[in-house]
């Protein structure tokens, strides 16, 4: 609360004025830090995005391909071209990406490729840092709206968050995020949900240890091949004939 300084003597006025200026400085500093945080968040993956843009200038990606976008589960999928040899795939995964980052960079990562289908894998990092299932869904809706403004009929698939044993303590929130997203997708045209959860569990409902690398968070090749098996029926007709 700011005191009324008009009825005070000179020393009191000086103290009152100092208190006011100090409070004002704190407010300005807090706002400045908030602005800096916003800028840092926006630029956190700038180098990653610029690297993709430079690679695309040097070797333009195929148009009308299936585009993968999202976090490290796609970024680390280095064998995707071998695992899906009958499809043209463009991979735009970035390590540690969240759904909000995908919204922020959609016009640079996604739209220039003019894909025929988009498959997302995001949400796990969101949950890991404490975002709610509702926030993940809200950001997913924002991504869909941003893309559909330019590509109105494009199919967009949300690859459900996986039950990695290294983050099994987050399983209830991950499952809830999958549930609310899947329920929303069921009400919308040209949105698909890739449900990986149950296939990655043992018969007694625990995460399968054979599908992960040493960190128990990211899939190994067997984990990616399982993903291919589940995804393939959603991909449509192959665009390449295998010899």
Give the ranges of each region predicted by the language model:
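Oxyanion-hole/transition-state-stabilizing segment in secreted/luminal serine hydrolases
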Residues: 74-90, 99-137, 157, 161-165
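A short helix->loop->beta-strand "cap" motif at the edges of active sites that frequently abuts
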Residues: 151-155
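Conserved beta-strand elements of the Class I
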Residues: 67-69, 90
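Catalytic His-Asp segment of secreted/periplasmic serine-dependent ester chemistry enzymes
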Residues: 163-243
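Extracellular glycan-modifying ectodomains
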Residues: 59-61, 108, 125, 138-150, ...
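N-terminal secretory targeting modules
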Residues: 1-67, 74, 78, 82-83, ...
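N-terminal cationic-hydrophobic initiation segments that often serve targeting/anchoring roles
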Residues: 81, 110, 148, 185-186, ...
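Charged helix-capping and loop-helix junction motifs
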Residues: 133-143, 173-178
């Amino acid at each position: 609360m700011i005191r009324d300084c008009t009825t005070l003597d000179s020393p009191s006025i000086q103290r009152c004025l100092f208190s006011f200026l100090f409070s004002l400085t704190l407010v300005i500093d807090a706002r400045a830090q908030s602005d800096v945080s916003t800028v840092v968040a926006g630029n956190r993956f700038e180098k990653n995005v610029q690297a993709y843009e430079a690679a695309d200038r040097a070797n333009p990606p195929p148009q009308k391909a299936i585009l993968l976008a999202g976090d490290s589960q796609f970024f680390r999928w280095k064998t995707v071209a071998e695992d899906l040899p009958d499809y043209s795939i463009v991979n735009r995964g970035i390590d540690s990406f969240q759904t909000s980052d995908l919204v922020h960079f959609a016009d640079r990562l996604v739209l220039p490729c003019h894909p025929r289908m988009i498959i997302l894998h995001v949400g796990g990092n969101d949950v890991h840092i404490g975002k709610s299932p509702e926030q993940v869904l809200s950001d997913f809706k924002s991504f869909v709206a941003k893309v559909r403004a330019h590509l109105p009929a494009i199919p967009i698939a949300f690859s459900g968050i996986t039950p990695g044993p290294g983050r099994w303590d987050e399983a209830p929130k991950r499952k809830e995020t999958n549930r609310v997203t899947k329920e929303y997708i069921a009400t919308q045209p040209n949105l698909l949900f890739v449900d990986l959860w149950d296939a990655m569990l043992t018969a007694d409902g625990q995460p399968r240890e054979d599908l992960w690398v040493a960190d128990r968070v990211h899939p190994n090749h067997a984990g990616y091949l399982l993903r291919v098996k589940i995804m393939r029926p959603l991909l449509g007709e192959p665009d390449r004939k295998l010899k």
